[in-house]
From Swiss-Prot:
Coiled coil: none annotated. It comes from Anaplasma marginale (strain St. Maries). The modification Phosphothreonine is found at residue 200. The gene is dnaK. Residues 625-645 have a biased composition (Basic and acidic residues). Keywords: ATP-binding, Chaperone, Nucleotide-binding, Phosphoprotein, Stress response. This is Chaperone protein DnaK.
Amino acid sequence: MGVIMAAERIIGIDLGTTNSCVAVMEAGTAKVIENSEGSRTTPSVVAFTENERLVGELAKRQANINAQNTIYASKRIIGRRYDDMRDVKCPYEVFPAKNGDAWIRARGEGYSPVQIGAFVLEKIKETAERYFGAPVKKAVITVPAYFNDAQRQATKDAGTIAGLDVVRIINEPTAAALAYGLDKGDKQRTIVVYDLGGGTFDVSVLEIAEGVFEVKATNGDTKLGGEDFDNAVMEHMMESFKQETGIDLHNDPMAVQRIKEAAEKAKIELSSRLETDITLPFISSDSTGAKHLSLKLTRAKFEGLVSELIERTIEPCKKALDDAGIKDTSKIDEVVLVGGMTRMPKVIQRVKDFFGGKEPCKGVNPDEVVAIGAAIQGGILTGDVRDVLLLDVAPLSLGIETLGGVFTPLIERNTTIPTKKSQVFSTAEDGQTAVTIKVYQGERKMAVDNKLLGQFSLEGIPSAPRGIPQIEVTFDIDANGIVHVSAKDKASGKEQTIKIQSSGGLSEEEIKKMVQDAQDRAEEDEKRKKRVELKNSAEALIHSTEKSLNDYGDKISSADKSGIEAAIKELRECLSNDDSSSDVIQQKYDALMQLSMKLGEAAYSAQKDSGTSTDSTASDTSGNPEERVVDSEYQEIKKDDEDKK
């Protein structure tokens, strides 16, 4: 096989609740790509200021002063209804969209969680493109194993909006297993992947042998993750403060954001320390003056606060083992820990206890292993990784509502995918000429208790007594775990098909519009970036010219000196005026550059006379401005013409 060009490469993306990561296969090895800040993971945080949109570390840094417009953990909201948001606590506003889905409001604008995910993916895409020096179009994106069909489609939509062709959706524990087991030889092994991340918990049982990775069973909880551990500490902090001062901080977004950051920091510290001090000065005030939050949190107290959360991970483990037909935990060869929360000693110990004292594997980086697995899957699809077969499963049963509101599964959970299955149904009433097919996903006996994925109608059925018409319903699940459902009347041949849409509240037209908006804004974003680079170069020119003026000003004529000082003043005033266009800044920049050549000549003469060398001259600032500045990662929200700035 020939060399894969950058545009043909398939990157692997772990779109996480707390952090995201991107990797790629190079020379048969998966490599994690660092972002522009030099980090191997990027915070899944998006912030909206008055003039710009920030993503990643820049967004996270300003959260304390912009809490209501800083969006984090949006992955926990994807595919969820507004009335199902009781467990999600955040300082930003969540509101019901027209269709009842949970959306997010920032700076007065409504955003689907799908859009927020797309903004994070854009940043990840830029990280990969900076590394390759070429456009990147294709990606494998991971999702929690227990994500339902609509959430998977929503994730794929986010990739589309970000300008990516999502060639495969892969379950996070399965990706981790790929990363763990790729170089483990041909020996048959049964492994468990215990994945406790920022927003979700998954557990998968896999058999690995001779390059075949077969998922035997999966289970989980999409409402359990590190965010819940943070919330437990936050509640403890706020309750302690209330008891001490009588002040309730729950309705103070800025205080809540500060407490959240402190809680997360304390949680991380307690993985390696027995106690930590939490101090937040000036957290609030009353008639007596400023109030400070200060308390000591021990590891034992923290473990007590979250013991119920840790215990909630055990029941899914039991169900996964039962579904896989494993009655004895000694049959498990390896337990692989994934997700940042698995660094917590109490979590490690509870997993060890449940699996019969088996020490969990610590040979993988829990923050990077999922992205590495996604990159390996990308390598499989390109042919860069050979002799590997991945067999995943449907995490939840899929079926339709039948007479009496009963849920009738067509595809049972843990069925290997891709798969296709048909079943014949009939009418419930005499003379019925149309049927409504309601598609559900879940494990409850009554349809209403499961997740409604979508519905469609099949009309034009020939009138006949009830039970006579034969309507064939077919479920087709592709390798991404995304469902297509069709219904066909065998007598008339009439057929209706539905592809389950995401629960992100976005129609295909809206998604297309967002994609177009992103493309249209690319030129504007580039202008904004060039403007910032130009301003940075101008500031550097002013600084170096003033230094040279101080060193060599007495060696040029007073007229030249006055001219340079005037040019510096004009450029500085231009930079301080937000309405100055890039063209005007460039003109003032060029004018000062030209005048500063006199200083360069004076410096050269001084060096020649003294026989020494120096590089602190104004002429040192010449050249391409792009080569002297660091890229600033943000996007302009306002769509004003650049010249008006």
